[in-house]
């Protein structure tokens, strides 16, 4: 019997696990993931604010795997021998495969700033969210670094929580305007929202150094903190470069529109960890991984049956809804920018519906 090895339990692999409940294939399936839980990042802002519990935003992987007839192994991959078709884990175990699929997300960029690695909190890998949240909730002077969607959402959600508790506002530091990769209208709107909620914004200044008590910017500002959260965008996993697999300039695994590595067609990848050769500018966002998930499933089946796979075609625009705290949301879709409580209600509905598909227990 052939072996399928799933590395990571991101959005696309959750879908694969669910499909194995519905459709049995003549294949032995194993999933390797560093935590018993897979956390859904779309709900992190609501969790930070106190809208969701930890159980709302996580999937118990051993239970889901058991229902799908999949072997769950708690651990992380260290390297891949694509020619020998084996994966070495951080514990020293060697896992063989006939078919390998990667869905391990990304890591945190910019952490090489002096002092950041030793003093800043990081959410990635995502199973750190509960520990990080506890520390940020208890902070007297919380500071968030990062002006992208993740940094803004978390900072606004913490600000909303702290407002209810009568605590000081959150400070957000960004080397650019907020939401730099979005439209000028969206950039202007999110800054207006942040300022209206009394958030302390330090924009267009890079972090030059981090001490045990202060963040020092390139402009010479010294911002005191007792908890510092680093949310500066995605960085590729080092494993692909170390394993001498085909990668793009940033180190992400390079795949074709079938989600396969051209040089090693038995290796698939989806989500943030991969770059599509024909669509290199596709955003590193969960919505993309969700749309790739059915393509991944169909192409795993096609590979086993020695048939041609289907091709992933990105949409021209993706719906994005940022939680801005107090059950309001900023909806972005193409040229549409809308800030309203109805935007948050739509986001809440989408997120809860996603989680309901994979929840198997109350763990």
Give short role names for the model-derived ranges:
Residues 1-70, 153-182:
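Beta1-alpha1 glycine-rich phosphate/pyrophosphate-binding loop at the start
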Residues 1-5, 67-141, 229:
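FAD-binding core/adjacent interface of flavoenzyme oxidoreductases
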Residues 11, 127, 149-150:
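Residue-level detector of alpha-helix initiation sites
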Residues 26, 72, 78-79, 95, ...:
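A Rossmann-like FAD-binding core segment of flavoenzymes
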Residues 118-138, 222-227, 231-291, 298-299:
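FAD-site-proximal beta/loop scaffold in flavoenzymes
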Residues 251-268, 313, 327-336, 343:
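FAD-binding beta-loop-beta segment adjacent to the flavin cofactor pocket
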Residues 287-315:
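Internal hydrophobic alpha-helix adjacent to the cofactor/substrate pocket in enzyme cavities
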Residues 326-363:
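C-terminal auxiliary extensions adjacent to catalytic cores
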């Amino acid at each position: 019997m052939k072996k399928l090895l799933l590395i990571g339990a991101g959005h696309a692999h959750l879908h694969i696990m669910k499909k194995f409940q519905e459709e049995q294939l003549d294949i032995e399936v194993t999933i390797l993931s560093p935590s018993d839980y897979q956390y859904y990042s779309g709900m992190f802002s609501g969790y930070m604010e106190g809208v969701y519990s930890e159980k709302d935003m996580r999937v118990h992987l051993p239970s889901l795997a058991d229902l799908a007839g999949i072997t769950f192994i708690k651990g992380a991959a260290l390297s891949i021998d694509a020619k020998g078709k084996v994966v070495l884990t951080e514990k020293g175990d060697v896992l063989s495969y006939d078919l390998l699929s990667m869905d391990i997300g990304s890591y945190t960029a910019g952490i090489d700033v002096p002092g950041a690695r030793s003093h800043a909190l990081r959410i990635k890998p995502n199973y750190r969210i509960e520990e990080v949240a506890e520390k940020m909730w208890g902070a007297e002077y919380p500071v968030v670094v990062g002006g992208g969607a993740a940094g803004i959402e978390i900072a606004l959600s913490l600000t909303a929580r702290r407002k209810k508790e009568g605590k000081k506002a959150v400070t957000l530091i960004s080397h650019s305007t907020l939401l730099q990769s979005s439209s000028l209208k969206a950039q202007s709107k999110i800054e207006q929202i942040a300022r209206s909620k009394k958030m302390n914004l330090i924009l267009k200044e890079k972090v030059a150094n981090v001490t045990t008590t202060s963040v020092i910017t390139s402009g010479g500002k010294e911002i005191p903190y007792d908890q510092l959260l680093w949310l500066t965008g995605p960085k590729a996993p080092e494993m692909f470069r170390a394993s001498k697999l085909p990668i793009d300039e940033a180190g992400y695994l390079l795949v074709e529109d079938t989600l396969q590595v051209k040089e090693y067609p038995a290796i698939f990848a989806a989500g943030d960890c991969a770059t599509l050769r024909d669509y290199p500018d596709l955003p590193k966002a969960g919505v993309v991984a969700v749309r790739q998930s059915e393509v991944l499933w169909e192409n795993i089946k096609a590979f086993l049956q020695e048939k041609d796979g289907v091709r992933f075609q990105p949409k021209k625009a993706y719906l994005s809804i940022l939680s801005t705290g107090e059950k309001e949301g900023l909806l972005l879709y193409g040229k549409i920018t809308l800030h309203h409580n109805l935007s948050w209600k739509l986001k809440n509905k989408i997120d809860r519906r996603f989680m309901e598909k994979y929840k198997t227990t109350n763990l």
